[in-house]
Every structure is written in C-alpha cells, then in structure tokens.
Amino acid sequence: MLAAVIHELGHFLVLCCFGIRVRSLRVCVLGAVMEADTARLSYPRELVATLAGPGANLLFCALLSIWDESRFTPLVGASVVLCVFNLLPILPLDGGRALYLLTAWCFGGQVGERVARVTGACCAVALGGGLFYVMACTGGSLWLAPVALAAFAAAARLLLNYEIFL
C-alpha cells in the first residue's frame, strides 16, 4: 500500500509543480487512476508527469537500499513490482500513457492513439494469457485471476475503441 501511495504522490507532486489541478483519484483492479486537467500540458510535460509515479517508486527503492536492513525488502519488492507493472505499455497504465504521449509527440495524436491501442491490446492479451498459464501450472494462484481478467478486459476495450483516459 505504501508503494502505491508513493507512486501516486509522484504524479501528484509533478502535476502540482506544473500548476495542474487533480480532479479525482479512483482505485480499480489494475491500481489507481488519477484524473487531472492535463489538457493544458504539452506532450513532454505530460510525459514527465506520467513517468513521475514509476520514478517515485525507483527513488523510494534507492533511498531504502541505503540501509542494509532486511525489514525493508518487502517494501523494495513491492515498489519494484509496482513500477515494472505500471510501465507495461497497456492503457491506462503509465507505460501505455507514456507510449501514447511519445508517439503522439513525434507523429501526431491519431498515430499515437493507434500505436498505443494496438501495442496495449497485444501486451494485455500476453499478460492475461501468461497469468492464466501460471495459474494452470501452479494449480492455484487464484489471486492472479482478477489481474488476468482485467488485462483481457483492457485488451477488449482497446480493440473495440472504448474511451480509456486519452
């Protein structure tokens, strides 16, 4: 939970530095989604705000690794997992948003959206399939089922062109 708070705090602090108001914070199966008035931001600034969450997790890990304490291992592990998961190129995760922003900045909004949707759908199907494979191989791990189903739902939304925080 602390890793998630630090992650969202990273987004929040950068948005505040850019003078952007945060409208809401919603928690869902894939994590939390912060809604802000980012329409005023340029692609590079929004990219910085998007990557600030994973960056905060990495900074937190670096700070904790200064002390050689085994009691911090779970916190470091949770922060690394959250960072890596959020960098997957699946909308609405930070990685999917970053992919959209980079391609939109270089090639325009339509190309950015198309690239982010197709890449995100492929990655979401691979993630969901991989998680179901792990569940089948281990004969359990049912705690992975909600994440796998959410990944398949994200792929369906991306392929069917439903609105996903763009």
Per-region residue spans from a language model:
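Hydrophobic transmembrane alpha-helices and their immediate loop junctions
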Residues: 1-166
